[in-house]
C-alpha cells in the first residue's frame, strides 16, 4: 500500500494549518491569495523539496516571480497509480469589471479507489462521475442556487464543503470591499 500526500490550494485562509511536510504534490487551482498565498508558498515548497507543484497556467508566472518552479497543469500527471487530471479552464465570473483568470480543477483517481474532484473557483467543469466532491459553500462569484445545482448535477455520494472561510470575519471584509468598489458611487459603506 502506497500513501501519497497532496495539498490543494494552501491559501491565506488556512491559518490554522501551519507547516506541512512530506508532501508529494502541491496543487494550485488559481492565483487568488485564498488559494495561492504568496507569503506562504515559498516556505511550503522549501519544507517539501521533493513535491511537484502543479498549477493553472497563469499561476506559473506568479510562482516564478517568487522563485518557485511550478508546472502548468495541462494534462494528466501520474504519481504511481494515482492520476491527477486537470478539469476546466477559467475562474467563474466575479464581476464584469474584474478580469477573469485561469482556474484548473483537479480530479484525483486511482484503480479501485473513489474518484475525488476539487473544482477550485468554478462550477462549470465536468470531471465525469465522482464519488467524493469538494464543493464551494460560499463565494463572491456564486449564488446559493448555483452551489446546490452543482451538488445535484454531480450527485456524488460524498461531498466536502470548501471555500467556507468567506463566512467568517475576513469574508465579510471581502464582501464589503467588493460592495464598496463595485456597488456604485452614491453610498457610504
What are these regions (language model features)?
Residues 57, 137, 162-164:
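Short secondary-structure boundary segments
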Residues 1-21, 72-129, 141-146:
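Core dinuclear metal-dependent hydrolase active-site scaffold
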Residues 41-42, 46-92, 177:
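Portal/gating segments that form or line small-molecule/metal binding sites
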Residues 123-125, 138-142, 156, 165-167:
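Short Gly/Pro-enriched loop/turn and capping motifs at secondary-structure junctions
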Residues 64-80, 148, 152, 157-189:
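Binuclear metal-ion centers of metallo-dependent hydrolases, dominated by the metallo-beta-lactamase
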Residues 11-55, 131-134, 155:
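Active-site metal-binding motif and surrounding structural segment of the metallo-beta-lactamase
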Residues 33, 59-60, 124, 166:
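Alpha-helix capping/helix-boundary segments
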Residues 8-9, 27-28, 85-87, 135, ...:
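Redox-cofactor binding/interface segments in oxidoreductases and associated redox assembly factors
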Amino acid at each position: 500500500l502506497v500513501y501519497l500526500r497532496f495539498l490543494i490550494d494552501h491559501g491565506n485562509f488556512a491559518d490554522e494549518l501551519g507547516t506541512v511536510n512530506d508532501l508529494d504534490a502541491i496543487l494550485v487551482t488559481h492565483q487568488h491569495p485564498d488559494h495561492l498565498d504568496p507569503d506562504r508558498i515559498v516556505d511550503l515548497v522549501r519544507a517539501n523539496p521533493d513535491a511537484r507543484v502543479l498549477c493553472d497556467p497563469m499561476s506559473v508566472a506568479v510562482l516564478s516571480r517568487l522563485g518557485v518552479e511550478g508546472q502548468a497543469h495541462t494534462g494528466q500527471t501520474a504519481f504511481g497509480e494515482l492520476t491527477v487530471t486537470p478539469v476546466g479552464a477559467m475562474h467563474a465570473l466575479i464581476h464584469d469589471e474584474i478580469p477573469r483568470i485561469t482556474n484548473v480543477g483537479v480530479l484525483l483517481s486511482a484503480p479501485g479507489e473513489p474518484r475525488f474532484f476539487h473544482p477550485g473557483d468554478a462550477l462549470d467543469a465536468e470531471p465525469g462521475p465522482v464519488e467524493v466532491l469538494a464543493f464551494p459553500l460560499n463565494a463572491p462569484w456564486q449564488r446559493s442556487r448555483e452551489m446546490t445545482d452543482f451538488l445535484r448535477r454531480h450527485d456524488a455520494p460524498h461531498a466536502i464543503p470548501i471555500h467556507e472561510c468567506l463566512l467568517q470575519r475576513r469574508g465579510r471584509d471581502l464582501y464589503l470591499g467588493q460592495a464598496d468598489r463595485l456597488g456604485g458611487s452614491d453610498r457610504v459603506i
